[in-house]
Amino acid sequence: MKIFKVLLITLMLLANTAFAAEFSAQVKTSEGIVQGVYDEKYNVVKWFGIPYAQQANREKRWALPQKAEKYTGVKDCSQYAPANLQFNGKNVIGQEGVLTLDVYRPDTGENNLPVLVFIHGGNNQTSNSRLWMGEKFAKEANAVYVSVQYRLGLLGFNNLPALANSNALNDSGNYGLIDQAYALEWIKKNIDKFGGDANNITVSGFSAGGRDVMAMLISPLFKDKFDKAISFSGGLTVADFAESQKIIAGKLAPLVVADGICADEKDAAEWLMQGSEEVRSYLMKLPGERLAPVMAGALIRMKSFPHLYGDGKVLPKEGFAAEKFNSVPLLMLASSDEFTSFLARDPYFKNRMDKVLKDKLITEEFVFANKYGSKFYGFFNGQESAEDIYAKYKAPIYVCMFDFGHDPAVVGETYAVKTGATHGIFLPFLTDQSYPYTVGTDVFAKSGPQELSDIFIASLAAFIRTGDPNNALLPEKWEAWTPQNRAETVFDADGKQAKVYQRSNDTSYDGILEELEADNSLNADSKNYIIKNILNGRWFSGELDTKYHNEN
């Protein structure tokens, strides 16, 4: 049986090399030889599921990543690795502690290509390295693209006292972020074998991954691990260390009660706050399938799932008020309808989405909630982040706004209202898929979106090469952000052509709050409910919650 499996793998690998190739799909890494696959459609080579560290399960749970084991022979990297353990809203899927990465590169003889590393989103609770499939980008940007998997949810972020072991890195509880640092070390050591330039690495991330990237800018752990940074819809978030411990203990308390250790949740939470071996043993023995659903569905609320702890070692206790930054050229992207995807999953709208555009009041409520939620969230992901770090940041900052998705003539009325320029709208412009959007690939195949895709990829390609996104396809210069110009480049398109232009964005929290206060387009009860129950407690809601005395 073993001989048959070896023969089968050998035949499969030979089948993938049956046509002329310029770059070998067999690459010798620090752990051994990995065998990738050729993609004739895109003319790229790709490797899936390369371990950058040992699987962090069993006794390695809530421990620092450990050096990947060496392997003999040829490791088949033609199939995706499992996702990390997570709750997808219905079921627990994946495996615990999958620390792997995927690599894509053009099938050419070129070396010293720029490297783009991607940290996937999903609130640091869900998703996997396939969120952004890299074939199109690797080919058109002529770059090496790497997508990283890291520990998620409470398996990736947990700072309860019982898990401390007197190692400051481990005691931070930021295991998922430390995984990313370890992945960047592996990439720096090995990427030249894939034709990448180890001295030209850009780290990027979307949503939670974007917030992770922004956190890297203040983390001593990430010093000299990358040369440029891109944050796609990721603002500035750091959780208070002590408060996070209390929240996590409270969320795990029902499991302790269910297991008969404590009589009620109050006692259970107090027990979990002990730094005892008894608590540690209990946590280590908990099945991952029971841990994954805890705190699920946080939907950009830090108190629903605290992570990125300001521990004083991995992340400064003072967060982004820190004096020192890992200052590298930085590009930040926001979208003009960031909030629609979160509204669609909010308990209030989740079962009412089919009535949007059919029921007058529900439509008005949705439009109102999206208008202000997206104004706040878009500002948080771009302009506000630039404002907050500019004085201490010693490298250029570029800001852009994706505005595609509003024109019913291009995307249809339903998509224009319910989705618009939603959180992650940039992704279909980097792939040939509409995923994760249901509008369909025919929309993105129109000449306008295709031209926009060309310009966007060219801008990212220029940035990862030089630290400056300007290129021949841009119709006007993309200015670096300053407090004086507040410059951002807008990316949009109609059905026939791209619409890319520079503008000054003078949005402010005070301005949005004043507009919201004066807006009487919605009845008072609905307006009050949305402010106090839908817009509250989000990454961007601090000033809103203070003004309206919201619970968060």
Show the residue positions of the predicted features.
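Serine-hydrolase-like catalytic core of hydrolytic proteins
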Residues: 82-273, 315-344, 395, 453, ...
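A structural signal for well-ordered alpha-helical segments within the folded catalytic domains
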Residues: 45, 95-99, 178-185, 211, ...
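Catalytic-loop region of hydrolases
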Residues: 21-110, 283, 474, 514-518, ...
